[in-house]
From Swiss-Prot:
Participates in both the initiation and recycling phases of transcription. In the presence of the delta subunit, RNAP displays an increased specificity of transcription, a decreased affinity for nucleic acids, and an increased efficiency of RNA synthesis because of enhanced recycling. HAMAP family: RNApol_bact_RpoE. This is Probable DNA-directed RNA polymerase subunit delta. RNAP is composed of a core of 2 alpha, a beta and a beta' subunits. The core is associated with a delta subunit and one of several sigma factors. PROSITE patterns: HTH_HARE (PS51913). One of its GO terms (cellular component) is DNA-directed RNA polymerase complex. Residues 114-178 are annotated as: Disordered. Keywords: DNA-directed RNA polymerase, Nucleotidyltransferase, Transcription, Transferase. It comes from Staphylococcus epidermidis (strain ATCC 35984 / DSM 28319 / BCRC 17069 / CCUG 31568 / BM 3577 / RP62A). Residues 116-178 have a biased composition (Acidic residues). Pfam families: HARE-HTH.
């Protein structure tokens, strides 16, 4: 059965991935993802909001279903249309090859390594910018005097005594729970 013969009920019941397989088989040519979705919208009389969730699932299925092949530029076709050699040549991602450095290359003073030219450009960046705070000892001394005058400071010894007392109370509570 051709995809144009589908009724709205059939479109509602059938998965988009199966309809895409039928559509691509009928057309015998690669199609853009958005053209496939537009075809489904027109067949089912859908608005985009009506099928938004189905589109997400459809895209996931397209990528995972072995029957389909992304041939670039968001064009999709059926894997059956391509030989293994075609897939390896045209579709498989190319790997950029680099020369391997040997001992002679490492001794060559004119050889620039990756990233060396970027390091020189970073030299003009200031170590400190205007929006960063500076922590001078003189400022801290003024703050210490101000806090002492306000009687806000807790002596370090008092702080340790409080912490030890809390630990003992916690240990007593643990013994009680056992």
């Amino acid at each position: 059965m051709k995809i144009q013969d589908y009724t709205k009920e059939m479109v509602d019941e059938k998965s988009f991935i199966d309809m895409a397989y039928t559509l691509l088989n009928d057309k015998q040519t690669t199609m853009n993802l958005y053209d496939i979705i537009d075809e489904f919208k027109s067949l089912g009389g859908y608005e985009y909001e009506d099928i938004e969730n189905r589109i997400v699932q459809f895209y996931t299925d397209l990528n995972t279903d072995g029957r389909f092949l992304n041939v670039g530029e968001n064009l999709w076709g059926l894997r059956d249309w391509y030989s293994v050699d075609d897939i390896e040549e045209k579709i498989a991602p190319t790997i950029q090859k680099f020369d391997i450095l040997d001992d002679e290359d490492e001794e060559d003073q004119n050889l620039k390594l990756l990233g060396d030219d970027d390091a020189d450009e970073d030299d003009d960046i200031p170590a400190q910018t205007d929006d960063q705070e500076t922590l001078d000892e003189s400022d801290n001394d003024e703050d210490d005097v101000e806090m002492n005058e306000a009687d806000i400071v807790i002596d370090e010894d008092e702080d340790e005594d409080i912490a030890e007392g809390e630990e003992e109370a916690f240990e007593d509570a643990e013994d009680f729970n056992d």
